[in-house]
């Protein structure tokens, strides 16, 4: 006759074994600061002996209606979180705030490789207590799905005019206006601007006037307007700006865009870029084609990522790590007033070695 199998240990049986309350056992796993070190150690040692792994997280979630995690929504492939330096720093900042406040972090990728149905299901199925939405367009369909969840939401960068939602970002227009003013002050009059995508449709080409009037990504629109304003202030026709859009955010995207810009206007003496990854790629392309930076071409970026700074790129540095940290804090520790908060973080113009007077 086989021996009677031992019943699985439960929170109740562990409490009975130790002659303590169920709350004491629960606190040993979930709120250790509520117990003395000796008592917690005794609870954990007995739990190990009886084979009790801890409170069921699913049951706890159902009971407390808390998932204990933050959802980070980004309209990019998952690999973008780790390959783009600015995005990587941002994610690290969110993770830092989650760790400090005892929360988990769930990455919710709704990039273009997913169908609308799959992306919607990912947002609806995310077991989280709130969302940080990173840099999506005005017309992003998943933003509406996030809002339908009726959970706390913090938007980062864009969209900039979402009513009733807290946002963390920078003054993109002012930062780009200062950078463009610096380039124009060096004497440049034939400017090219390499931008990240302006809309959800796939384009990798020169940007016409109609598209420039109606981009759905606020950050890119504001940076373009910043360049226009600097050109106007310097007495340069803004319509002379050569703009090339890159849909894909790949290590080669800036080089491809630089080629298009120079073919469209061989008189260009400066290539401004709305991201450092575009600028670094453009510099690689120029070097491969015998165009010296900055002697023959000025190149500027935006973000201030470590590789850009190490290569002496003239750029705008923004606090991506701090931006992520503040977004997480605002979500997990919202103001007592319950009112949305708009935080505009400082940027810094970095005068590197890639900008000089036109040849």
From Swiss-Prot:
Residues 9-64 form the HTH lacI-type domain. One of its GO terms (biological process) is regulation of DNA-templated transcription. This is HTH-type transcriptional regulator Rv3575c. Residues 11-30 bind DNA. Gene3D superfamilies: 3.40.50.2300, lambda repressor-like DNA-binding domains (1.10.260.40). GO terms for molecular function: DNA-binding transcription factor activity; transcription cis-regulatory region binding. Overexpression of the gene in M.smegmatis impairs the utilization of cholesterol as the sole carbon source by M.smegmatis, activates the host's innate immune response and triggers cell apoptosis. Pfam families: Peripla_BP_3. Transcriptional regulator that negatively regulates transcription of the mce4 operon, which is involved in cholesterol transport and utilization. Acts by binding to the promoter region of the mce4 operon. It affects the utilization of host cholesterol as a carbon source, impacting the host's innate immune response. The keyword Zinc does not apply. It comes from Mycobacterium tuberculosis (strain ATCC 25618 / H37Rv). Keywords: DNA-binding, Repressor, Transcription, Transcription regulation.
């Amino acid at each position: 006759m086989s021996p009677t199998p031992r019943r699985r240990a439960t929170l109740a049986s562990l409490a009975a074994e130790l002659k303590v309350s169920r709350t004491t056992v629960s606190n040993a796993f979930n709120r250790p600061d509520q117990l003395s070190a000796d008592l917690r150690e005794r609870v954990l040692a007995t739990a190990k002996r009886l084979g009790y792994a801890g409170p069921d997280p699913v049951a706890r979630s159902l009971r407390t209606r808390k998932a204990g995690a933050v959802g980070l929504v980004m309209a990019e492939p998952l690999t973008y979180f780790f390959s783009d330096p600015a995005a990587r720093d941002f994610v690290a900042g969110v993770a830092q705030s989650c760790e400090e406040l005892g929360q988990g972090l769930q990455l919710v990728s709704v990039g273009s490789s997913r169908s609308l149905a799959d992306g919607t299901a990912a947002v609806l199925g995310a077991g989280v207590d709130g969302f940080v939405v990173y840099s999506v367009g005005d017309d992003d369909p998943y933003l509406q799905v996030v809002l339908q969840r009726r959970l706390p939401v913090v938007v980062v960068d864009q969209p900039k005019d979402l009513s009733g939602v807290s946002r963390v970002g920078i003054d993109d227009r002012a930062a780009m206006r200062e950078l463009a003013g610096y380039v124009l002050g060096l004497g440049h009059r034939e400017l090219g601007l390499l931008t990240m995508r302006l809309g959800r449709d796939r384009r990798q080409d020169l940007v016409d006037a109609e598209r420039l009037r109606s981009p759905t990504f606020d950050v890119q629109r504001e940076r373009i307007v910043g360049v226009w304003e600097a050109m106007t202030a310097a007495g340069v026709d803004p319509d002379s700006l050569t703009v090339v859009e890159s849909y894909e955010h790949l290590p080669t995207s800036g080089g491809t865009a630089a080629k298009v810009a120079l073919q469209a206007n061989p008189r260009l003496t400066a290539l401004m870029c709305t991201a450092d990854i575009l600028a670094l790629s453009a510099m690689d392309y120029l070097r491969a084609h015998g165009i010296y930076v900055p002697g023959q071409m000025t190149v500027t970026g935006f973000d201030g990522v470590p590789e850009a700074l190490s290569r002496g790129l003239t750029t705008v540095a923004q606090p991506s790590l701090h931006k992520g940290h503040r977004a997480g804090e605002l979500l997990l520790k919202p103001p007592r007033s319950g009112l949305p908060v708009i935080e505009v973080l400082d940027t810094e113009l970095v005068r590197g070695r890639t900008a000089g007077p036109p040849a």
